[in-house]
UniProtKB/Swiss-Prot annotation:
Domain of life assignment: Eukaryota
Gene that specifies this protein: IL2
Functional note: Cytokine produced by activated CD4-positive helper T-cells and to a lesser extend activated CD8-positive T-cells and natural killer (NK) cells that plays pivotal roles in the immune response and tolerance. Binds to a receptor complex composed of either the high-affinity trimeric IL-2R (IL2RA/CD25, IL2RB/CD122 and IL2RG/CD132) or the low-affinity dimeric IL-2R (IL2RB and IL2RG). Interaction with the receptor leads to oligomerization and conformation changes in the IL-2R subunits resulting in downstream signaling starting with phosphorylation of JAK1 and JAK3.
Record protein name field: Interleukin-2
Compartment(s): Secreted
Disulfide bonds: C78-C126
Glycosylation sites noted in the Swiss-Prot or TrEMBL record: T23
Gene Ontology cellular-component annotations: extracellular space
Listed InterPro entries: 4_helix_cytokine-like_core, IL-2, IL-2_CS
GO BP terms: adaptive immune response
Family matches, as PROSITE patterns: INTERLEUKIN_2
Signal peptide bounds: 1-20
Amino acid sequence: MYRMQLLSCIALSLALVTNSAPTSRSTKKTQLQLEHLLLDLQMILNGINNYKNPKLTRMLTFKFYMPKKATELKHLQCLEEELKPLEEVLNLAQSKNFHLRDTKDLISNINVIVLELKGSETTLMCEYADETATIVEFLNRWITFCQSIISTLT
C-alpha cells in the first residue's frame, strides 16, 4: 500500500520536474534575446555617437515617444511602435562619413526579437510620457530597460 503511494509520489515529482524544465530554459532564452536586443541598440547608439558623425545635430532634432512606464516585457510594444521612425531617422543620417551598416537588418532584428519577447498576444496600448526624447535619450532608455530586465533574470 505504501509502495503504491511512494510510486505515485515519484511519478508526480518526475512530472513536476519535467514540466518545470522548459521554464528555466525559456528564462535563458529570454535572457539571450534581451542580450541580442541590447547589443543591437548599443550598436546603433555607438554609430550615432561616433565623433565623425556630421549629422548628429540634425538627428537630435527628431523626437521619439517614450512610455510613461517600461518595466515589463509587454512594454516592448512601445519600442516596436517607434521602430519605423527610428529607421527613417537613421536612413536620413547616412553619409559617406557616417554609415550604420545594415540599418534595415538591425531594425528588422530588433523587430523580430521584440515580437518574440513581448509575445504576439500583447495588445498593450502604450501610455506615452508627455515629453519626447532625442534619438540618444530614446536608445539609452531602452538600453537601460534591457539591462534592468536582464538583471532580474540572473
